Amino acid sequence: MEYPAPAAVQAADGGGAGPYNSSELLEGQEPDGVRFDRERARRLWEAVSGAQPVGREEVEHMIQKNQCLFTNTQCKVCCALLISESQKLAHYQSKKHANKVKRYLAIHGMETLKGETKKLDSDQKSSRSKDKNQCCPICNMTFSSPVVAQSHYLGKTHAKNLKLKQQSTKVEALSKRLTNPFLVASTLALHQNREMIDPDKFCSLCHATFNDPVMAQQHYVGKKHRKQETKLKLMARYGRLADPAVTDFPAGKGYPCKTCKIVLNSIEQYQAHVSGFKHKNQSPKTVASSLGQIPMQRQPIQKDSTTLED
């Protein structure tokens, strides 16, 4: 039996640990365009996917070398906003960030290098639409079937990551005008507060966010929102509208009574509790009225004592 030469085995294995390393034999067989893309991906892999940076100097070096992916105020790979220096260092040195970078490169490694984007022709654009059923570039996830992909795109995780990506785009636009990263974060918070006022983007009653008005309309006619409206009307009926406990508790988590510091599971339990003696005894109005009756009870006693002395 004949065994292949060690050089041939090394050439077949690729000669390296990285997924984008290629042998001279493969490079000789590949077209120029494919070899160029492979070289770009290999350079990006070496620049980003090495060991996790340790210390401030390595983190700053990584940011300067890959400004298309990382900045001092945001990580485009993780869709994370970095509002302080300590948060920036902790994020870029974390294992979670390193794993997401590897997944990002597995999807985008052939397309991105130092801010350059490949120009796609019509065929590539049509293939990109088909790739949506295979992977989600926003969440860095892969799918086994179009059904799983559609379920992901309609889920909360994708909506949350899409919102974070939109926020990171706003941060990038603001950072071009504002040099102070902390001023950028405060300005972004102001924009977020304005969005929370828009009912097509945020439901203050259920603490839910929406990507488009159609999704918002579906929420407002849904069972969850109607249940919250019923709860609010019930609170108002029993004099609880001005109680901040209605908004302090998470949406859909029972019926809170801040006076007694308990949460009831149903409307019937809440009605029975509010009508009961224990709740009325703990009510501030009852305590105030009982305190006001104390001097009224002492006055007739004093008058009786004076009449007896006379």
UniProtKB/Swiss-Prot annotation:
Its main location: nucleus. Zn(2+) 1 binds at residues 75, 78, 91, 97. SMART domains: ZnF_C2H2, ZnF_U1. Zn(2+) 2 binds at residues 136, 139, 152, 158. Pfam families: zf-met. Residues 283-292, 299-310 have a biased composition (Polar residues). There is a cross-link at residues 114, 170 (Glycyl lysine isopeptide (Lys-Gly) (interchain with G-Cter in SUMO2)). The modification N-acetylmethionine is found at residue 1. Residues 1-33, 278-310 are annotated as: Disordered. One of its GO terms (cellular component) is nucleolus. Keywords: Acetylation, Cytoplasm, Isopeptide bond, Metal-binding, Nucleus, Repeat, RNA-binding, Ubl conjugation, Zinc, Zinc-finger. GO terms for molecular function: double-stranded RNA binding; zinc ion binding. It comes from the Eukaryota. The keyword Cytoplasm applies. A zinc finger (Matrin-type) spans 70-104, 131-165, 198-232, 252-286. Residues 1-12 have a biased composition (Low complexity). Transmembrane segments: none annotated. It is found in: Nucleus, Nucleolus; Cytoplasm. Binds with low affinity to dsDNA and ssRNA, and with high affinity to dsRNA, with no detectable sequence specificity. The zinc-finger domains are required for binding to dsRNA, and also for nuclear localization. Forms a heteromeric complex with XPO5 and ILF3. Found in a nuclear export complex with XPO5, RAN, ILF3, ZNF346 and double-stranded RNA. Interacts with XPO5. Interacts with ILF3 in an RNA-independent manner. This is Zinc finger protein 346. It comes from Pongo abelii. The lineage of its organism: Eukaryota, Metazoa, Chordata, Craniata, Vertebrata. The gene is ZNF346.
